Amino acid sequence: MTHLSKEAVIVRSALEAKGLETPMQHSSLSAQEKKQQIEQHMTSIMTLLGLDLADDSLAETPHRIAKMYVDEIFSGLDYGSFPKITLIENKMGTDEMIKVQDIGLTSTCEHHFVTIDGKATVAYIPKDKIIGLSKINRIVNFFAKRPQVQERLTQQILVALQVLLGTDNVAITVTATHYCVKSRGVMDASSQTTTTALGGVFKSSAATRHEFLSRA
């Protein structure tokens, strides 16, 4: 059984309490067992599509997809891979906005399993704790590495940072291109979707909200 960090447990519990957790079922399968079963199913799917898996270009594709799903693009389904979080006391008394802009993220649309490609901007006003800057990027990418809808992704990042930092004063905006819109259906290659999640003073103060959004 995978040992979960204290931070992973409190973040997961907070998301469950707010109804913001990704719809998931508990699985007792190991990562290797998941990969084996996914590989088998992908072999069946590709065969049904009429692809020749005896061809050397396709022979390893089911294995590659299985490994990619479990170890890479859906690794955020496993809280055992939640990033190690570094927090320090706010001894400097910082009480102004800290913002990390243009955090690159790649996720997967849970409706069609195609790419969501975009950027996030994250800001918070410290209370008692300050988080290592790279940890913000890692938290964004942890939640991106799941089948997602952008609205939930944005809220998950917000709640995770709020509980870790011990403050409601957190703000997130995500702007992304959805390949379920770009590469199929309406096939609109130019549109982007922006979602915002605001907490604490970012929600209650028009001036603080404007400061965040005007530079997001």
Swiss-Prot record:
GO terms for molecular function: GTP binding; GTP cyclohydrolase I activity; zinc ion binding. It is an enzyme of class 3 (hydrolase). GO terms for cellular component: cytoplasm. Its EC number is 3.5.4.16. Zn(2+) binds at C109, H112, C180. It catalyses: GTP + H2O = 7,8-dihydroneopterin 3'-triphosphate + formate + H(+). Keywords: GTP-binding, Hydrolase, Metal-binding, Nucleotide-binding, One-carbon metabolism, Zinc. One of its GO terms (biological process) is one-carbon metabolic process. InterPro entries: GTP-CH-I_C/QueF, GTP-CH-I_N, GTP_CycHdrlase_I, GTP_CycHdrlase_I_CS, GTP_CycHdrlase_I_dom. The keyword Nucleotide-binding applies. The keyword Signal does not apply. Pathway: Cofactor biosynthesis; 7,8-dihydroneopterin triphosphate biosynthesis; 7,8-dihydroneopterin triphosphate from GTP: step 1/1. Homomer. Belongs to the GTP cyclohydrolase I family. This is GTP cyclohydrolase 1. The gene is folE.
